């Protein structure tokens, strides 16, 4: 009887850890009452991705500029949204790549200033302003791993990092100079670069934390203006609705020595341990 009770407890714990690892790293609640306008020069937006079809951009023109509330000083840069329209009964997934500071529509709590390509899916341009839209956040359908670039004009003593090609937004970027023992958190600027004012010549580690609390690490040999690296990982989007299918987890840059350490790694370890124990108990029962 005691063994049976233990077995049931273990089974419950196992299911708990399964459901824990399948929680989307951000809220996907449906928001209604959103509106949209369009603009025609979406390149070089405030999120720092430059040309949308260039190396830092999403590789397509399905983007939006967010009003101050949604833009949130850059915190929603790189977030993707699935927006549905009652005008066409269609939906479109866009990435936030810009801010929309204009007084007027952009000051609403949920307003998207869309590229014409995205707007056209949701309604005719002649309508001007689309009202009554609904949306929810979704992971971005990017290919390969999270990437990092050091800002134009970086030098041995100052740099700023742009994190891009991520499926989810970034909560924190920290730097540890080689030989030091602690990471220092950087400040995210409103133009989406993480400012690192206390660099020294030589190598350093960067720790990138997703909004879901998952970490990606990369070692960079030295500060170099506009130098880009692909890390060896992508953030997990297990449990998210609207996860785009397609290739993911491409090849990492072999020279950078990046690695990943995640809470879900820990919970799957727990899972394996619990499974082994459960099987052990089953064997003992027989
Ligand atoms: C969209 O769907 C609603 C509800 O099903 C329907 O009444 C409306 O005619 C549809 N509109 C278009 C443009 O298809
Ligand atoms: C966007 O949301 C709508 C409504 O929930 C859904 O039907 C559609 O499949 C979603 N699109 C994508 C690409 O996830």
Curated annotation (Swiss-Prot):
Q: Which UniProt keyword terms apply here?
A: Disulfide bond, Glycoprotein, Membrane, Signal, Transmembrane, Transmembrane helix
* Annotated membrane topology: Single-pass type I membrane protein
Spans traversing the lipid bilayer:
266-286
Top-rank taxon, per record: Eukaryota
The Expansin-like EG45 domain, residue ranges: 44-145
The positions making up the signal sequence are 1-21
Q: Which CDD domains match?
A: DPBB_EXP_N-like (cd22271)
Please indicate if the UniProt record lists Disulfide bond as a keyword: yes
**SMART domains reported in the protein's UniProt record:** DPBB_1
**Cell compartment(s), UniProt:** Membrane
Q: List the disulfide bonds.
A: 47-77, 80-140
Which residues does the annotation flag as glycosylated?
Answer: 82, 89
Q: Which Pfam families match?
A: DPBB_1
Q: Which family does it belong to?
A: Belongs to the expansin family. Expansin A subfamily.
Role played? May serve to lubricate the movement of the cellulose microfibrils during cell growth and wall extension and/or they may serve to maintain the fluid state of the slug cell wall.
UniProt xrefs under NCBIfam families: expansin_EXLX1
Q: What's the protein name?
A: Expansin-like protein 1
Organism of origin is Dictyostelium discoideum
């Amino acid at each position: 009887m005691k063994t049976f009770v233990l077995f049931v407890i273990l089974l419950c714990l196992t299911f708990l850890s399964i459901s824990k690892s399948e929680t989307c790293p951000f809220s996907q609640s449906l928001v209604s009452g959103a509106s949209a306008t369009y603009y025609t020069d979406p390149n070089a937006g405030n999120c720092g991705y430059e040309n949308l079809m260039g190396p830092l951009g999403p590789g397509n023109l399905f983007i939006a500029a967010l009003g101050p509330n949604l833009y949130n000083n850059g915190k929603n840069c790189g977030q993707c949204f699935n927006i549905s329209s009652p005008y066409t009964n269609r939906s479109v997934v866009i990435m936030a790549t810009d801010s929309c500071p204009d007084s007027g529509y952009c000051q609403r709590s949920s307003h998207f200033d869309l590229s014409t390509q995205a707007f056209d899916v949701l309604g005719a341009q002649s309508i001007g302003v689309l009202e009554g839209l609904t949306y929810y956040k979704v992971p971005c359908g990017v290919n390969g791993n999270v990437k990092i670039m050091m800002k134009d004009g970086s030098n041995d003593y100052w740099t700023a990092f742009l994190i891009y090609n991520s499926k989810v937004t970034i909560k924190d970027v920290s730097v540890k100079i080689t030989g030091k023992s602690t990471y220092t958190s950087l400040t995210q600027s409103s133009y989406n670069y993480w400012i690192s004012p206390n660099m020294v010549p030589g190598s350093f580690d960067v720790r990138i934390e997703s909004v879901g609390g998952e970490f990606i690490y990369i070692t960079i040999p030295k500060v170099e203006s506009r130098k880009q690296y692909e890390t060896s990982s992508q953030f997990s989007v297990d449990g998210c609705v609207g996860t785009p299918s397609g290739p993911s987890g491409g090849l990492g840059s072999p020279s950078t020595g990046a690695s990943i350490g995640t809470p879900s790694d820990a919970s799957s370890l727990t899972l394996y341990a619990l499974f082994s124990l459960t099987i052990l108990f089953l064997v003992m029962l027989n």
